[in-house]
Amino acid sequence: MEGWRGAWYVPCLASHETLQELCRKENLRCKSIGITNKSLKSYEVEYLCDYKVEEGKEYYLVKWKGWPESSNTWEPQKNLKCPKLLENFLSDKDEYLSRMKEGRALKVRNSVKALKPAVADYIVKKAKQRIALQRWKEELNRKKNHKGMILVENTVDLEGPPIDFYYINEYKPAPGINVINGITTGCECSDCPAEKCCPKEAGFILAYNKQKKLKIQPGLPIYECNSFCRCGPDCPNRIVQKGTQYSLCIFRTNNGRGWGVKTLQKIKTNSFVMEYVGEVITSEEAERRGQFYDNQGNTYLFDLDYDSDEFTVDAARYGNVSHFVNHSCDPNLQVFNVFIDNLDLRLPRIALFSTRTIKAGEELTFDYQMKGSIDLTSDSADGLSSSRKRIRTVCKCGAVCCRGYLN
């Protein structure tokens, strides 16, 4: 599958452990899979796999970093210098016992002489998940081009990073779709906003107040200053283009809604939070994909119908943090169309702004059908394609005003 800007995404068929073993045999270094000069010459504990007591001594089965599982060894507890990994081991063990209702969570030491295979298996899976999520977090933060950090958290189940999802920062046009930035001129303002600033030239008012917070009603478009404008980066009409300013966390929900997104910082009312990006496809292609997504119960198609219903944004495989934002019938985010370097009315950028003050630790949500505060008769993004939905999806948002279904 062709990637972004001509790159190619080719899935690796070999496991992480197999690649490590091959690198060792060929004496190759590969930092991304933990094979470095240091790991080739020394042993570092990656995680603990099992526990036993022999002749009164405690032993832990150690998975060595950069070495295949076939090289695991039993090591006495006194030799281990990894308190955090030991803490993870004990915590995962207690968590499993508690969930399985095998009695109260017991302390390993002085309690048992060996773990049951099911317990050890869970501990290994949890350790592998923790490593996979850490790698995913690092990958997301390498690829994102905005200020805010992205964290990843799963304290609910053993689900790891999504398969076949590629992080992008802007629209990815599907083959045959040309997104041309037609801007050749910009405003001459030295102190925006002025009489002939970008929004006024387009026939609209400036979207932001002096505090750089949104002041327009849902349904109205946002026209920001562009790359040809005379004003500098501190211009109050450059907000969405600066990207997400908040640190966010992709987390596993505990009520069957899969992944979600929460903010790690307080967000004030009418603040820009993030863009909704994905693959830009035709409405015909969206119709075809929609049938497949219906059967899966997923909703990633966002119609762009500000001027026409020609294009749709599909964030199923290509997207950013917004891919993981859940629906709510009482959301704290609102969708707005934004035009910056591309004034093609068929291809507005989709920005999510806060509708109220959002506390640190609170989940971010938007209404997939955008009912409520938005004027549905106005020219606005149409939301995650309701017209294509043939199979009704039960809503689990839990809001008092919940409509019962996502579509």
UniProtKB/Swiss-Prot annotation:
Subcellular location per the Swiss-Prot or TrEMBL entry: Nucleus; Chromosome, Centromere
Gene Ontology biological process terms, A to Z: cell differentiation; cellular response to hypoxia; epigenetic programming in the zygotic pronuclei; methylation; negative regulation of transcription by RNA polymerase II
Keyword list, A-Z: Cell cycle, Centromere, Chromatin regulator, Chromosome, Differentiation, Metal-binding, Methyltransferase, Nucleus, Repressor, S-adenosyl-L-methionine, Transcription, Transcription regulation, Transferase, Zinc
Molecular function via GO: histone H3K9 methyltransferase activity; histone H3K9 trimethyltransferase activity; S-adenosyl-L-methionine binding; ubiquitin-like ligase-substrate adaptor activity; zinc ion binding
CDD domains the record matches: CD_SUV39H1_like (cd18639), SET_SUV39H2 (cd10532)
Record-linked Pfam families: Chromo, Pre-SET, SET
Residues engaged in binding Zn(2+) 1: C187, C189, C192, C197, C198
GO cellular component: a single term: chromatin
Every SET domain range: 246-369
Annotated ranges, domain Pre-SET: 185-243
Residues binding Zn(2+) 2, per UniProt: C187, C198, C225, C229
Residue sites binding S-adenosyl-L-methionine per the record: R257, G258, W259, Y300, N326, H327
Domain of life: Eukaryota
Catalysis performed (reactions): L-lysyl(9)-[histone H3] + 3 S-adenosyl-L-methionine = N(6),N(6),N(6)-trimethyl-L-lysyl(9)-[histone H3] + 3 S-adenosyl-L-homocysteine + 3 H(+)
Keyword set includes Hydrolase: no
Protein residues bound to Zn(2+) 3: C192, C225, C231, C235
Binding-site list for Zn(2+) 4: C329, C395, C397, C402
Residue stretches making up the Chromo domain: 43-101
Stretches assigned to the Post-SET domain: 391-407
EC number: 2.1.1.355
Record remark on domains: Although the SET domain contains the active site of enzymatic activity, both pre-SET and post-SET domains are required for methyltransferase activity. The SET domain also participates in stable binding to heterochromatin. In the pre-SET domain, Cys residues bind 3 zinc ions that are arranged in a triangular cluster; some of these Cys residues contribute to the binding of two zinc ions within the cluster.
Family affiliation: Belongs to the class V-like SAM-binding methyltransferase superfamily. Histone-lysine methyltransferase family. Suvar3-9 subfamily.
Function in brief: Histone methyltransferase that specifically trimethylates 'Lys-9' of histone H3 using monomethylated H3 'Lys-9' as substrate. H3 'Lys-9' trimethylation represents a specific tag for epigenetic transcriptional repression by recruiting HP1 (CBX1, CBX3 and/or CBX5) proteins to methylated histones. Mainly functions in heterochromatin regions, thereby playing a central role in the establishment of constitutive heterochromatin at pericentric and telomere regions. H3 'Lys-9' trimethylation is also required to direct DNA methylation at pericentric repeats.
Stated name of the protein: Histone-lysine N-methyltransferase SUV39H2
Lineage summary: Eukaryota, Metazoa, Chordata, Craniata, Vertebrata
